Regions:
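Conserved NTP phosphate-binding and transfer environment spanning the P-loop NTPase/kinase superfamily
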Residues: 1-131
Length: 131
């Protein structure tokens, strides 16, 4: 019988901590705006980001924290333009980005409430922060 997803999340967290693993989230999806305006990331960008992770290129690069989702965003990557790294810079209309990011982070926050009390407090605090 499958267990609640919070059980598997806890097991993953313990394994990552005990083995001192780095975890990377690479956006290979959509950038630059809503459907009809934005575009998928080019495969060359995905490959450059993955190569950067595998070759340790991010070990000495500065990161900035995304104010909506709390993700650490690298300031540079060989072969990738800066606007491909920073989600807001990929959008022509920065106000549209802010509105969309705020709405999406609110949806994440609301959905995650069902996990309250089932996951560690640090996990709850790491989630999106709607503005």
């Amino acid at each position: 019988m499958p267990r609640h997803s919070s059980v598997y999340a806890g097991l993953l967290q313990k394994k990552l901590q005990s083995h001192h693993c780095k975890v990377w989230l690479i956006n290979t999806g959509w950038r630059g705006g809503k459907p009809g305006v934005g575009h998928r990331y080019p495969i060359q960008v995905t490959r450059a980001l993955l190569s950067g992770v595998l070759h340790g290129n991010f070990d000495s690069i500065a990161f900035t924290k995304d104010s909506y989702f709390g993700l650490e965003v690298p300031s540079a990557c060989p072969g990738v333009e800066k606007d491909m790294l920073n989600p807001m810079l990929a959008w022509q209309n920065h106000e549209d980005y802010r509105a969309s990011a705020s709405k999406l982070s609110s949806l994440f926050e609301a959905n995650f409430k069902k996990f309250a009390g089932k996951v560690a407090l640090d996990v709850c605090n790491a989630g999106p922060k709607p503005s």
